[in-house]
Amino acid sequence: MVCVPCFIIPLLLYIWHKFVQPIILRYWNPWEKKDAQGNVIKKGPDFPFECKGGVCPFVPGAKKPEKASVGPAEESQNPPLNAIAAETEVDESKKEI
């Protein structure tokens, strides 16, 4: 059998969140957005990704800046990860034999 608080508390919380809280928040809502004069803001902010004046700052698929070309001296200092992984696999196979 379930104890009384284990049954009553979730039931009261459900009733509070579904029915009582929305009614109370209509008349007293401390989390409402207000402007500097204390008036409630009814309208939300504009969509920030609109193109205004024929210029759109957020173009999908825009080109990313390319890195400077890497010379052969820099490649030897930083070998690709695949080469490192291949070398470790070869070393491990030699250890097993």
From Swiss-Prot:
It comes from the Eukaryota. Residues 64-97 are annotated as: Disordered. Keywords: Phosphoprotein. The keyword Phosphoprotein applies. InterPro entries: UPF0729_C18orf32-like (IPR026776). It comes from Drosophila simulans. This is UPF0729 protein GD16342. The modification Phosphoserine is found at S69.
